[in-house]
Amino acid sequence: MATKKAGGSSRNGRDSAGRRLGVKKSDGQYVIPGNIIVRQRGTTIHPGTNVGLGKDHTIFALIEGRVEFLTKRNHKIVNVKEITNA
């Protein structure tokens, strides 16, 4: 009698669904308060002006305006610039 179970594939075949992370609004795009700009694990992109940071590190808009991505001292930062009607 064999004491080792044959290496079949019956115990395989499970996988988790993707988490739908990433940038949701790109540079220059119009946002309203509450719009999600970035979904991420950890602060890969840091919050700047007029954006909030959720407990799961989601960055969202606090005001109406345009999204702006920039790099300062090797940190990616996202801001929302207010639209001025001139």
Curated annotation (Swiss-Prot):
The keyword Ribosomal protein applies. Residues 1-26 are annotated as: Disordered. The keyword Ribosomal protein applies. Keywords: Ribonucleoprotein, Ribosomal protein. GO terms for molecular function: structural constituent of ribosome. GO terms for biological process: translation. One of its GO terms (cellular component) is ribosome. It comes from the Bacteria. Belongs to the bacterial ribosomal protein bL27 family. HAMAP family: Ribosomal_bL27. This is Large ribosomal subunit protein bL27. It comes from Rickettsia akari (strain Hartford).
